[in-house]
């Protein structure tokens, strides 16, 4: 029992208020500053069977004795503000004070779980029997249990400044309160054990911008520690009722941002079943009701709270679909000159714009007929003179209107003159690449045919030129060109109007040609099997059609 005195000397450092209770003289000395030492000795003699002097002298119990006495003494105000009250400078631990100690010291020591724990092996307060991996969690549970006991002892409405009984007289009325407090602590411990198998990274407290480190001086405005506050179970039940319906289905990838009263942004990342939701609600309730958590950052790591900065916004990928519509209808600049020209030629051949297609068709036919009867030099000179006569006439007409003060004399072709015909570097590179690729492709094909890289292809080309010799004897080149222009402006339009019939006739012609090819190959030695296979394939295609 010789180690009891340092405990009380250590607890003497807590701030105390003047007590209106008359001093107890039973078992104490009038000149002593520790007037309740006799009471503490009697208390420890009664419980000598349950605890030993070794349990009283451990560093962990000394720490909890100091915290418990500090929290109970300051019951006149808020517990969070009392816990942050600075220690007086220049005073030793064992220096006595002039003020009277609180008469509820025995009751306070009774309410400390660490001082009345059982020496049974396997109890969570015994650090020797707990595995090394579970000791941080056991320390956390002991602190949470102790804080729950202090909160209930503070909220029971018994102020030490108005108490008029000695610790021995208050010992019997406090028995029901101790039972209720013990049951509440066991229930909180059970809920924390249920939430233990979840992932440790459930909550991520983020400091709000401008808050910096956790501000310990910011009190919680929602709950007062000196009021008659009930147990913490209603708050936990409300949290469980709120998340109760979500226990039936797993939650994937949800992020809930909530800002608590201390300007922390708590972001629970829930990637599992409803057990993690339960753990989230429990930890939020404990954090809001136990302000020491804001003063102990290591506890955040122990229960899965990790300080982290704001998450950078996810970049959004935006794709511009420039060719969602046709270039002509949407007015978007063409990606390549060939695609733009191809669309315009298709519009002309399908007569989408009747006026434009008619003008182009008429101009081409007149030019070709002129070339048919005259030389190309004379035709080009006459066309150039006709164009110049038209433009010069319009220009002179505008000048005459300006001379008679009826016009501004502007060039009628100024809009065309303002058109920018220069090519950008990208367009020049694109055009040069297209021209180069086409020239190289043409040269490769000519080499393939004329240097007999493939004998069959070279024979086909020879047959084509042989047929053209007969065509050239009958038709002129300009005549063939005129027929080609007429076919380009008429065949696509007719095919669109009579597509079904044309497809049927084209299929019949294709089948006949395939039969003819098969007969020719059958007469060539060594190609009989190939000819029969080709004939079978062509026959099956004809039947299917």
From Swiss-Prot:
Pfam families assigned to the protein according to its UniProt record, in alphabetical order: Reticulon
InterPro entries linked to this entry: Reticulon, RTN1-4
Compositional bias ranges of the Polar residues kind: 199-230
Segments for region (Disordered): 1-183, 199-250
Biased composition (Low complexity): 14-25, 157-166
Gene Ontology, cellular component aspect: cell surface; endoplasmic reticulum; endoplasmic reticulum membrane; intermediate filament; neuron projection; postsynaptic density; sarcoplasmic reticulum membrane; T-tubule
Membrane topology according to the record: Multi-pass membrane protein
Compositional bias segments (type: Basic and acidic residues): 32-43, 135-146
Alphabetized UniProt keyword annotations: Cell membrane, Cytoplasm, Cytoskeleton, Disease variant, Endoplasmic reticulum, Hereditary spastic paraplegia, Membrane, Neurodegeneration, Neuropathy, Phosphoprotein, Sarcoplasmic reticulum, Transmembrane, Transmembrane helix
Spans through the membrane: 368-388, 463-483
Main localization, broad class: endoplasmic reticulum
Subcellular location: Endoplasmic reticulum membrane; Sarcoplasmic reticulum membrane; Cell membrane; Cell membrane, Sarcolemma
Lineage: superkingdom: Eukaryota
Residues bearing PTM Phosphoserine: 44, 227, 229
GO terms classed as biological process: brain development; endoplasmic reticulum tubular network formation; gene expression; intracellular protein transmembrane transport; negative regulation of amyloid-beta formation; neuron differentiation; regulation of D-glucose import
Domain (Reticulon) ranges: 345-545
Pathological association: Spastic paraplegia 12, autosomal dominant: A form of spastic paraplegia, a neurodegenerative disorder characterized by a slow, gradual, progressive weakness and spasticity of the lower limbs. Rate of progression and the severity of symptoms are quite variable. Initial symptoms may include difficulty with balance, weakness and stiffness in the legs, muscle spasms, and dragging the toes when walking. In some forms of the disorder, bladder symptoms (such as incontinence) may appear, or the weakness and stiffness may spread to other parts of the body.
Subunit structure: Interacts with isoform 1 but not isoform 3 of SPAST. Interacts with BACE1. Interacts (via first transmembrane domain) with ARL6IP5/GTRAP3-18. Interacts (via N-terminus) with SLC1A1/EAAC1; the interaction promotes cell surface expression of SLC1A1.
Role noted for this protein: Inhibits amyloid precursor protein processing, probably by blocking BACE1 activity. Enhances trafficking of the glutamate transporter SLC1A1/EAAC1 from the endoplasmic reticulum to the cell surface. Plays a role in the translocation of SLC2A4/GLUT4 from intracellular membranes to the cell membrane which facilitates the uptake of glucose into the cell.
PANTHER family: RETICULON-2, RETICULON-LIKE PROTEIN
Annotated protein name in UniProt: Reticulon-2
Organism: Homo sapiens (Human)
Gene: RTN2
